[in-house]
Amino acid sequence: MTADLLPVRRALLSVSDKTGLVELATALAARGVELLSTGGTAKAIRDAGLAVKDVADVTGFPEMMDGRVKTLHPMVHGGLLGRSGLDDAVMAEHGIGAIDLLVLNLYPFESVTAKADCTLADAVENIDIGGPAMLRSAAKNFARVAVATDPSQYAELLASLDANDGQLSASTRFAFSVAAFNRVAQYDAAISNYLSAVTATDAAVPARAEYPAQMNSTFVKVMDLRYGENPHQSGAFYRDLYPVPGTLATFQQLQGKELSYNNLADADAAWECVRQFDAPACVIVKHANPCGVAVGAGNGDAYELAYATDPTSAFGGIIAFNKPLDAATAKVILDRQFVEVLIAPDYEPAALEYAQKKANVRVLRIPHGDGLNNFDSKRVGSGLLLQSSDNRGMTRDELKVVSKLAPTDKQFTDLLFAWKVAKFVKSNAIVYAKDNRTIGVGAGQMSRVYSARIAGIKAADANLVVEGSVMASDAFFPFRDGIDAAAAAGIKAVIQPGGSMRDAEVIAAADEHGLAMVFTGVRHFRH
């Protein structure tokens, strides 16, 4: 049986990250804890005027091989693995003293190998051997030993000691043990991923494959969800171990009901779409598709234009802004429509105060950040599809005019706006746009011409005038029928990737209808 409270009399400290080290060592010494340490950690403690015993004095064996061997010794691992009541005699026979607390973080393999100029030799030298071994020994023996692996745990460690008269509870020891095993798993995964990607070792900086032979991923649980995609499915949200700044995983929920699986999926689509724009923008998403997108003079203007695209679909949608949300716009939204989630990089205090009148509305803050996800993944039966993220932008200079008529300056602006939106619409995707706002969106149809027709129907239902608008298509037109449908609706310019066997027919259709057409040479399928 695990004793609930066990005293801490002897601690071994060995850290690469010296953050908070002196403060922790000082606090432990003040509580009468004997300190053992190694190398640079011992020096830092000693320089702070604290008494510390070198591990070499405990083992009777000096550090050797440039520090590669220093703690791989029975006097250390016996002190960590010894079981109270079972191993007391053998420990006494061999003079092994119990170690009650291990404070250790590992060589910085991840940060070293993240550098573009990291050599294979640098990577190898930052593979910790003794550290993970000690962590595993201490974590396995949580019945008697506590282990801390990160400076963020120090405050909790000291608070627990103070609350229990210099002792640590079984629940604290177990929680720290789990954290230690998780850290070792993360560390080993990073090493495996790095070395599995190395394809050539003849250069100082090794050649590495984009997709390693083995992929080990680590995710940290953020929360349980109300349910999965449907109420009969359970769900949870996990984030990357090191989330990219500015992405959904960095959100803070300020109010509202529990988030659902669909809430987060839609929130990600809305946020990734809106953060493309520099000017104030609003994106309204329903079932992972933008149903209204606009750039405006401010939040209120952008919202009104986005909402007008498809007021019916906006009901119960997710609304995202790329600028801090003001109180006036928040009031208009919450007074007008039912909204599942509001997203913005920040909020005026008055906006948050007003949102409290609708307590169920989920309000998310996602701090600004220019980071982009490098990879996208999708589970298939017993497998994982992994690809580089579709972060490809487009500028006017990259567009190729293929029609007899060239777009006007205003049409070029609208074409690039529509192209940005089309990237976030489920394929087959068609976007009608004018004046930096969507006029109609046709999403997820098996036939491209039907997406074009639906975009026109959406515009008509919203009493929006298509005449003079532009059209974006996420992929090439296999036939001219999509161009014919667009021209009949009043479209005057088209942006599409090109690349169809019938490009000549499609271009001829554009010329026949007096449409300007540009090719991007880039496809934006989204499934």
Swiss-Prot record:
This is Bifunctional purine biosynthesis protein PurH. InterPro entries: AICAR_Tfase_dup_dom_sf, Cytidine_deaminase-like, MGS-like_dom, MGS-like_dom_sf, PurH-like. Pathway: Purine metabolism; IMP biosynthesis via de novo pathway; 5-formamido-1-(5-phospho-D-ribosyl)imidazole-4-carboxamide from 5-amino-1-(5-phospho-D-ribosyl)imidazole-4-carboxamide (10-formyl THF route): step 1/1; Purine metabolism; IMP biosynthesis via de novo pathway; IMP from 5-formamido-1-(5-phospho-D-ribosyl)imidazole-4-carboxamide: step 1/1. The IMP cyclohydrolase activity resides in the N-terminal region. Belongs to the PurH family. The keyword Translocase does not apply. GO terms for cellular component: cytosol. CDD domains: IMPCH. Residues 1-149 form the MGS-like domain. Keywords: Hydrolase, Multifunctional enzyme, Purine biosynthesis, Transferase.
